[in-house]
A protein has these predicted regions:
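Active-site-facing alpha/beta catalytic cores
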Residues: 7, 18-144, 148-171
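Flexible, charged surface loops at secondary-structure boundaries
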Residues: 79-82, 172, 382-385, 417-418, ...
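Terminal amphipathic helices with adjacent charged low-complexity linkers/tails
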Residues: 42-84, 89, 105-109, 157, ...
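Internal, non-catalytic "lid/hinge" segments that mediate substrate recognition, gating
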Residues: 114, 411-414
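Alpha/beta catalytic cores of nucleotide-metabolism and tRNA/nucleoside-modifying enzymes
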Residues: 1, 7, 17-24, 28, ...
Length: 474
């Protein structure tokens, strides 16, 4: 039967920001997940660059997954290039349709620095991303993220709801690599209590529909499905696998392993065990350890192994999407007698494709003008010399300068560069996302016009757009 080590690699610590969690809890969770070869999610709010490199003892506090949420707090070129996976948070299961809010009393000097905000001022994330109002806009953001980090997978976090199958299909067509289906449970770190109790639907309903529609549309093998929202036991993991999930996020359970006693004061900055507070006196009471978190996930993985063995299977892949292994039982009150779960338990026809992701690597997107820019600037950058490049652009050339920014962040200390280390003189109509996430050291001079999202996520670059002298606009 598949080993504990292999099963643990499918586990994820879901998005909980540095702000919702104390610095100690946030870092410990990342170290624990990295030690297991699993993944932790930074949540919305950035992460200190000192965590991007392994510690002297070999532990790694860098969150494998970096989240891009609606307010884009802490989202810089450096942040995006420190991840193996970039997650676009469209919504959160515990509070669907709502934004987020970090109260001012939680915004310490350190959190304000990471989020590029003001200490003591409440930070509000709007319900929508203001650059996503259609599936095409989402596809553009996925494209931009795959340019700023040429090696990272891109995931999209959705909320379980009726019709999610159609949405998931659109996300898959937009070239996402992973889709997260979030259920109504959870939301421990920073969700309003009224939403935690009354909003959302179970992950089982959303996961089953997303898996069925993706399978019927012959796209299931292109994407990974992950689910979260109250998963606690090995049985939960096995049921999620049978309903179609390949990865499993345990958030509240991980906090309990660190010492959470479920006082439900997460949003008030008064957590008595130092997990969801920024108060130094309360943070001093934090007693969580990496071993405790590793032990929890190890025991859950062991229970998964035992259930697999009892069913006669040797790998989790063998049961993914196998809803025929689930049966409805009558148990509980009279109000449950008429409950019909046939829609959830329907087995979709996968045809000749697998019921789980078989694509190796990520779903690649087309190159941009940057492929040529990197060739032209290579020698000068290797010598540390300034360079000026000129190009004629057209509106099909998207995310100009973004891949170049990625290369500079990875190879150079951009904080020490002159603003015009590389000058790009462009002429024509630039496509969407000109200078998206562009870093310090690049100067863009465009004579002409540009489409949407100019300077999205700008990380220090200079962008100058001037109309043509012959333009009728001036």
């Amino acid at each position: 039967v598949e080993s504990i080590t292999e099963i643990r690699k499918r586990f994820v610590a879901p998005a909980m920001s540095l702000g919702a969690l104390s610095p100690e809890a946030h870092e410990l969770l990342a170290v624990a997940m990295n030690r297991m070869g699993a993944a932790s999610n930074s949540g919305e709010g950035g992460e200190g660059i000192e965590r991007y490199k392994p510690k002297d003892n070999g532990d790694n506090a860098n969150s494998t997954i970096k989240q891009i949420a609606s307010a884009r707090f802490g989202v810089t070129a450096e942040y995006l290039n420190s991840a193996a996976e970039l997650q676009i948070k469209v919504a959160q299961g515990a509070k669907p349709g709502e934004g987020g809010q970090l109260p001012g009393f939680k915004v310490t000097a350190e959190i304000a620095r990471l989020r590029h905000a003001t200490e003591g001022v409440s930070l509000i994330s709007p319900p929508p991303h203001h650059d996503i109002y259609s599936i095409e806009d989402l596809a553009q953001l996925i494209y931009d993220l795959k340019q700023i980090n040429p090696s990272a997978l891109v995931s999209v976090k959705l909320v379980a709801q009726s019709g999610i199958g159609t949405i998931a299909s659109g996300v898959a067509k937009a070239m996402a690599d992973k889709i997260v289906i979030a259920g109504h449970s959870g939301g421990t770190g920073a969700s309003p209590w009224s939403s935690v109790k009354h909003a959302g639907i179970p992950w089982e309903m959303g996961l089953a529909e997303a898996n069925q529609v993706l399978t019927l549309n012959r796209m299931r093998h292109r994407v990974t499905l992950q689910t979260d929202g109250g998963l606690k036991t090995g049985r939960d993991i096995v049921v999620a696998a049978m309903l179609g999930a390949e990865e499993y996020a345990l958030g509240t359970a991980a906090l309990v392993a660190m010492g959470c006693i479920l006082v439900r004061q997460c949003h008030s900055n008064t957590c008595p065990v130092g997990i969801t507070t920024q108060d130094p006196a309360l943070r001093a009471k934090f007693e969580g350890t990496v071993d405790k978190v590793v032990n929890l996930f190890s025991f859950v993985a062991e229970e998964v192994r035992e259930i697999l063995a009892s069913l006669g299977f040797t790998r989790l892949n063998d049961i993914i999407g196998r809803t025929d292994l689930l049966t409805q039982v009558s148990r509980g009150g009279e109000h449950l007698v008429d409950l019909d779960l046939n829609n959830i338990l329907a087995l979709a026809d996968a045809g000749s494709h697998a019921r789980y992701r078989t694509v190796i690597g990520r779903n690649e997107v087309p190159d941009t003008l940057d492929a040529q820019m990197l060739k032209d600037a290579h020698d000068a950058l290797e010598r540390g010399e300034k360079i000026q490049l000129a190009y004629t652009v057209k509106n099909t050339m998207r995310a100009i300068g973004t891949r170049l920014s990625s290369m500079m962040v990875r190879k150079l200390d951009t904080s020490q560069l002159q603003p015009d280390h590389i000058t790009l003189r462009l002429r024509g109509s630039a496509g969407q996302s000109l200078a998206a996430f562009a870093t310090r050291g690049i100067r863009f001079e465009l004579l002409g016009d540009a489409n949407d999202y100019v300077g999205k996520g700008l990380s220090g670059a200079t962008v100058i757009v001037r109309p043509r002298p012959s333009s009728a606009l001036i």
